[in-house]
A protein has these predicted regions:
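Conserved lysine of the Walker
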Residues: 66
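Extreme N-terminal, non-catalytic leader segments
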Residues: 1-3, 28-55
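Conserved nucleotide-sensing/catalytic segment adjacent to the nucleotide-binding pocket
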Residues: 93-136, 149
Length: 223
């Protein structure tokens, strides 16, 4: 699938010293990612008029473009970004009961304690240890400065234990066919199988159990 490009007309009004209004039409090409990002930024800036900080969640299906959108938002608006991938379960946490529980496939307790609760308290520097899948252990602490808008990116970011902390919740979706194509392109045939057999079914179980998609504020399909 090629990137969808939209021609957008921006009208700029200028007032001269003689109070004559002149209009200049600027045409620029923007991708759907940028269009979506601008809509999200507008929503967040409106919320900033009422509270600070504003906490935004980007939830959705794997390979739907969550990380890509988060990167665009960070580039355009300078938001702080926190990734749910840094909060995978450690081996000792992956009990049979935990993995059978909808939404249990992430350490939401640690995400709550180390990210969301400090942000809600107004802490300006967040410290946490990302989980390293390669080594199956936590890495050294990282330090992230909390901006006026903080974005939580990744599947399970809208888990019921985390839901009420957010001011804006975004859901990204993708068709099964496009999802498979993207994962194959990114991870190869061998890398696709764990997604097909485990990760995608766990996500869909979680979405259905808590009606995550239906309850989110904004919904997008990212090209």
């Amino acid at each position: 699938t090629t990137k969808q490009v939209i021609t957008e007309k921006v009208i700029i009004e200028k007032v001269t010293p003689k109070k004559v209004i002149t209009k200049q039409v600027i045409t620029e090409k923007v991708t759907t990612k940028q269009v979506i990002a601008r809509e999200v930024i507008t929503k967040a800036e409106t919320l900033l008029n009422k509270k600070n900080p504003v906490l935004v969640a980007v939830e959705g299906r794997c390979a739907s473009g969550k990380t890509t959108l988060a990167s665009v938002l960070q580039d355009l608006a300078g938001w702080s970004v926190f990734h749910m991938d840094d909060f995978f379960l450690q081996p000792w946490q992956r009990t049979e009961l935990r993995m059978q529980t909808a939404g249990g496939n992430v350490d939401y307790e640690r995400f709550l304690a180390e990210i969301l609760e400090p942000l809600k308290k107004g802490e300006t520097e967040i410290v946490y240890r990302p989980y390293q899948c390669r080594y199956q252990k936590l890495a050294k602490p990282v330090y992230i400065k909390a901006k006026q808008v903080c974005l939580m990116e990744g599947s399970y970011s809208c888990h019921p234990a985390l839901w009420d902390f957010y001011d804006l919740r975004i859901f990204l979706t993708v068709s099964p066919q496009e999802q498979k194509r993207r994962i194959l392109a990114r991870n190869g045939e061998d890398g696709y199988m764990p997604f097909a057999k485990q990760w995608i079914p766990l996500e869909e179980q979680y979405f259905k159990a808590y009606q995550i998609e239906e309850r989110c504020d904004l919904h997008f399909t990212l090209c």
